[in-house]
Amino acid sequence: MHITLRQLEVFAEVLKSGSTTQASVMLALSQSAVSAALTDLEGQLGVQLFDRVGKRLVVNEHGRLLYPRALALLEQAVEIEQLFREDNGAIRIYASSTIGNYILPAVIARYRHDYPQLPIELSVGNSQDVMQAVLDFRVDIGFIEGPCHSTEIISEPWLEDELVVFAAPTSPLARGPVTLEQLAAAPWILRERGSGTREIVDYLLLSHLPKFEMAMELGNSEAIKHAVRHGLGISCLSRRVIEDQLQAGTLSEVAVPLPRLMRTLWRIHHRQKHLSNALRRFLDYCDPANVPR
């Protein structure tokens, strides 16, 4: 059996795109070359990797079994190439919203000041998206706002972060200490399910309320801040996210009858991920002692 990296690359691209036509475009190969590589791979394995449904290719149980192993081999092949040009490859980072928008930019700025020639790719999504990208080897390192339970991922505590309940300055809740009943009766504007912030808010805060009124779910923190500022409800986000608005007086902190709402931010990478010298150097800049507060 002589399975090639090209065959695995074709297989992975066909699975992602769902057709040999689109895969041929992404790989800059002819459609016949893509089809031949896929047929050869299935022949060597002695199984079909896709079910043919009309003109579509739908991955089956054999393909699902092969896919993570193919990705790992392709990633290792890239790492072999990078061993000889360690400082030339882009560092691929995926961070959840609070971290990617409010913490990492200052870290990356310091790194780029010292190493201006080295590229960095930063993507921002919710914590579930970050974990999936790490599992798929699409990024080198991830930063998330809640715990990760996958056995394929190594999670390391990174920073402590405080969550703050806040309202518009004109809200009655901003005028003094409030009760849990008042919090339960207020309209809440929260991050979407799947975000690390939402998971922690549900656990640390909302679990203490007898009930709560969900007014709105929004997909990013900036939208939540604007909605709260215009009096549409109250919310809970990282102090780092609303610090400027609190100081400017456009938002007000609500004094809740609970201990400080603290959470741990996590750094994650795939268990089989090779940490290159360039990546380790960047992680030195991410040391908690070096991260601006």
From Swiss-Prot:
Entry keyword Manganese: no
Pfam families: HTH_1, LysR_substrate
Disulfide feature: none
Name assigned to this protein: Uncharacterized HTH-type transcriptional regulator YeiE
GO biological process: DNA-templated transcription; regulation of DNA-templated transcription
Gene symbol of the encoding locus: yeiE
CDD domains on file: PBP2_CysL_like
Domain of life (superkingdom): Bacteria
Domain HTH lysR-type stretches: 1-60
Start-end of DNA-binding region: 20-39
Family the UniProt entry places it in: Belongs to the LysR transcriptional regulatory family.
Alphabetized UniProt keyword annotations: DNA-binding, Transcription, Transcription regulation
Record-linked SUPFAM superfamilies: Periplasmic binding protein-like II, Winged helix' DNA-binding domain
InterPro entries: LysR_subst-bd, Tscrpt_reg_HTH_LysR, WH-like_DNA-bd_sf, WH_DNA-bd_sf, YeiE
GO terms for MF: DNA-binding transcription factor activity; transcription cis-regulatory region binding
Record keyword rRNA processing present: no
